[in-house]
């Protein structure tokens, strides 16, 4: 019985020590039309390099006279399907629903795009994200752009 418990304990420790844990993702960038964007999220890895990310983001449409009047916030979940795996990097396709508000008006939408991530030796990742958002129920229908970010393992 002792051997069985020790073997079970060692197996649990070995499984918990894998490098495939969750990551904190922090991104910022520019989107069209005239939008600053910042995103924070949690990425949970799946098998074969795929992942799911739960995120929240805030942004602002900069305008000449009223800079803070064009803000928005939203949140959502994105499935990331691995397209190509490199030695230290990966190209993924991102797709998922989102919801939020812009100028006190609620919206729902879809997000799609691509993400390239490069992994450093310490486990941190650099991410280059191309996003396309299509939103419904208000005037801010399309947003697309580039974001740069890092992913920090837990």
Residue ranges and their predicted role:
Residues 43-47, 80-84, 100-102, 115-119, ...:
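Structural signature of outer-membrane beta-barrel channels/translocons
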Residues 19-22, 47-49, 83-91, 104, ...:
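Short loop/turn motifs that connect adjacent beta-strands in outer-membrane beta-barrel proteins
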Residues 25, 37-39, 74-78, 111-113, ...:
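Membrane-embedded beta-strand positions in outer-membrane beta-barrel channels/transporters
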Residues 1-23, 154:
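Cleavable N-terminal export/targeting peptides
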Residues 19-64, 151-153:
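Short glycine/proline- and aromatic-enriched beta-strand/turn motifs that initiate or cap beta-hairpins
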Residues 26-32, 54-60, 77, 93-99, ...:
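Transmembrane beta-barrel strands of outer-membrane/channel proteins
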Residues 26-39, 62-71, 99-108, 134-143:
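Solvent-exposed loop/turn segments connecting transmembrane beta-strands
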Residues 141-154:
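Outer-membrane beta-barrel "beta-signal"
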């Amino acid at each position: 019985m002792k051997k069985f418990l020790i073997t079970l304990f060692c197996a649990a420790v070995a499984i918990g020590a894998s490098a495939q844990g969750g990551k904190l993702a922090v991104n910022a960038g520019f989107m069209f039309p005239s939008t600053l964007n910042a995103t924070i999220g949690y990425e949970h890895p799946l098998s074969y390099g795929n992942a799911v990310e739960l995120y929240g983001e805030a942004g602002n449409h900069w305008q000449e006279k009223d800079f803070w009047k064009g803000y928005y916030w939203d949140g959502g979940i994105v499935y990331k399907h691995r397209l190509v795996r490199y030695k230290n990097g990966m190209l993924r396709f991102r797709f998922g629903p989102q919801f939020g508000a812009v100028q006190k008006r609620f919206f729902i939408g879809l997000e799609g795009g691509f993400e390239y991530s490069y992994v450093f030796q310490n486990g941190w990742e650099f991410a280059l994200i191309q996003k396309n958002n299509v939103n419904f129920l208000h005037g801010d229908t399309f947003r697309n752009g580039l974001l740069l970010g890092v992913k920090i393992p837990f």
